[in-house]
Amino acid sequence: MKKTLIITAAAALTACSNVPAPQLQSMQSYQVEWIGERPLIDSSMLTLTLLDSNRASGMAGCNTWTAEYQLKDDHFSLDSIATTRKLCAPALMEQEQRFLAALADVQRWEFAEHQQLLLWPAQGAPIKLWPTEQSDQH
């Protein structure tokens, strides 16, 4: 009986280790929930979409943004971030600047519980994002 239980437990553990880890997917969009230690301003929309050809884009709250990204294993970084230049309310503009600065500082990614994407800077708390429906944005 003990031997059967041990074999069953070992088989179950082996099966769990064969589940592939979730990966970042191109053409997937994410909606930002937190920037570091702070939640978003109510009704503001910040997004990130990973496009083909190592491009990313999204909404920064007031302006749209685009960048090149590098992805290798759990390392992730955004380079050459560019935005449109609309003006919005001061609080929204401040949040947008924090978001863009946080994006520029991202060094790695991971999925937390329930497929929440965490983009980690060199120091401090991550940007927290949730997946949205598949996107056709370009």
Tell me what each language-model feature is:
Residues 16-138:
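Lipid interaction determinants
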Residues 1-14:
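Sec-dependent bacterial lipoprotein signal peptides
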